[in-house]
Amino acid sequence: MSTMTKPEAAATNGLQVLQPSGWPQPKGYANGIMAEGRLVVTGGVVGWDVAGRFGDGFVAQVRQTLENIVAILAEGGARPDHLVRLTWYVVDMDEYITNLKALGKAYREVLGTHYPSMALVQVVRLVEPSARVEIEATAVVPR
């Protein structure tokens, strides 16, 4: 079975990080998370502001997307540390890789240091032509 990477995490957010014995520790995500509680699920969230305008550049769009996710979570009584999964869709994988350091900084500033299970997928395009990234989020609020 697995062990929690941060024992204090279960006390504050009810989540257990699943890390198979002997596997290398992932950096910036979790291999799996176990949770019990109320499910909060977003649709595909893009990086536009309340006026429907996209920021300039990939990192700005990612930051706004993460801020938008936090706003949606709050509507359901969830916090960033309740996230159990993020699925990222990007139109340019090289753009993502080139900006890893800045993306990590933006992620930590918006979501903190909680890293849920994540997947990253490159797609041909997104529904919104100006969007460079779209993220689906799943959170579990402890009962």
What is each model feature region?
Residues M1-V84, V90-R143:
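N-terminal presequence-like segments and the immediate start of the first folded domain
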